[in-house]
Every structure is written in C-alpha cells, then in structure tokens.
Amino acid sequence: MYKALITCVYTNSYTYYCRFGMRSVIAEAHFDGSRNFIVLLGGLRRYILTHPDQCVNMHMYPRGHPSGRHSAIDWSKPDPVEFPNWLKLRGNEVIMQPGDLLYLPTYWIHYIISLNVNYQCNTRSGRTSHYDEDIKKCGF
C-alpha cells in the first residue's frame, strides 16, 4: 500500500508525486517551471504564495546556482537588514486541509510549512507563458 503512495507514475507527459511531511518541515520558497496541481490527502499544510512579479523582492539565487529557483531568504526568520526587499514582498496564504486542491500556475513562488503529519499528491502538467516576462526580470 505505502509503496504505491511514494512511487512516481508516468502516464504520457504527466508525473504524479506523493509527499509526506512532519510538523515544522519546510520547503524553502521556490518556483516550478510548470503548472502544478496539489491535493492534500491528510493533515494540514500552510502555503505562502507570491506572484512571479515579486521575484525582484525575494533575492532569488541565480540561474545555474545549485539552489537556482529558490529564495536566499530564510522565510522562517527573515533578516530585513540583509534582505531589505523582504519588506516590500506581497503574497497570499492558504492553509490546506484534507480534500483541498491547490492550482499553482507556472512560476508562482511558494513556501510550504507542514503544520502536522500530512501527505499530499501533486502532478505537473505542462507550462504556460503568462508569467514569462515577470520571471525574466529575475534572470530566468
């Protein structure tokens, strides 16, 4: 049973991932280069979402860096002296509960905090070019 939850299934161009989280586990702020559909199957997860035009305020690691696509800011303890644009950053927050589905468009930046033991599955499905100009301003 558990093996089916943690393996990837490849069907045409769609890939399904299932992830488990424990309380306080964090996925650092980053963007994906494709559309992402996320369903929470159990537990609670907090997502902080920002429009791609906010990448200029996020001190993103550059293309080619091992952490490219990720923010250099520690969002759990941001330092506005080191990262002054942090204070300009605008975003939205959602607390996902079991059965919730979240759609992340291409390049939307997200920071994820597990609020308790939880599990989710997601699929990435192609990309859109709607936010290409926004993300290009940050060198991507």
Regions found by a protein language model. Give the residues of each.
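N-terminal accessory scaffold of Fe(II)-dependent oxygenases
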Residues: 1-101, 109-140
